[in-house]
Swiss-Prot record:
The lineage of its organism: Archaea, Methanobacteriati, Methanobacteriota, Stenosarchaea group, Methanomicrobia. Keywords: Cytoplasm, Methyltransferase, S-adenosyl-L-methionine, Transferase, tRNA processing. Coiled coil: none annotated. InterPro entries: Alpha/beta_knot_MTases, tRNA_m1G_MTases_N, tRNA_mtfrase_aTrm56. The keyword Transit peptide does not apply. It is an enzyme of class 2 (transferase). Transmembrane segments: none annotated. It holds the Pfam family Trm56. PANTHER family: TRNA (CYTIDINE(56)-2'-O)-METHYLTRANSFERASE. GO terms for cellular component: cytoplasm. This is tRNA (cytidine(56)-2'-O)-methyltransferase.
Length: 177
């Protein structure tokens, strides 16, 4: 089974709460096992843990991690690191190689990332060579890697489950109990 974890860099608690939460939600929905937050924001942790509690799955969040240490540990454990940016090799040119990776850390920044990230990453991946959202970069990359498979995924232990419907909202409560 493929393991994917997201490393979020440069999160500014006063500015980036919503976008970082959405980066985590997107990674979770598209198959990541967890998110490493390289800053201190217990509000993000609480928000994402609440989603996991209500909507199921086993997604974890680690707060205030050292990005260098996490990358080092990941690589020592046999993992590869993919840094998403506007700069680097175009995603379509690397998608097949990323799909083959069994243990992948996806790094996405908020503010300008430390220059050493470009050296620490196994791949610097351009998700379009124009300014864009980190949420879009994560979504496009993870969808290309998984080829849409997580869109059919069920999340065990969910208190709430959405039932697909052509019209209206259909939610089953306490489906995980």
């Amino acid at each position: 089974m493929k393991r994917i974890v997201l490393l979020r860099l440069g999160h500014r608690p006063e500015r980036d709460k919503r976008i970082t939460t959405h980066v985590g939600l997107t990674a979770r929905m598209l198959g990541a096992e967890g998110m490493l937050l390289a800053s201190d924001d217990s509000g993000i942790v609480q928000s994402l843990e609440d989603v996991v509690r209500r909507w199921g799955g086993n997604f974890y969040i680690k707060n205030n991690v050292s990005f260098k240490q996490e990358i080092r540990n990941w690589k020592e454990g046999g993992g590869k690191v993919c840094h998403l940016s506007m700069y680097g090799v175009n995603l379509p040119d690397l998608a097949d190689e990323l799909k083959k990776c069994d243990k992948l850390m996806i790094v996405v920044g908020a503010e300008k990332v430390p220059p050493e990230i470009y050296q620490l990453a196994d791949w610097n991946v351009a998700v379009g060579s124009q300014p864009h959202s980190e949420v879009a970069a994560v979504a496009i990359t993870m969808d290309r890697i998984a080829e849409g498979e997580p869109l059919e995924k069920e999340f065990p232990g969910a208190e709430l489950t959405i039932v697909p419907a052509e019209r209206g909202k259909h939610v089953i409560e306490n489906a995980g109990e």
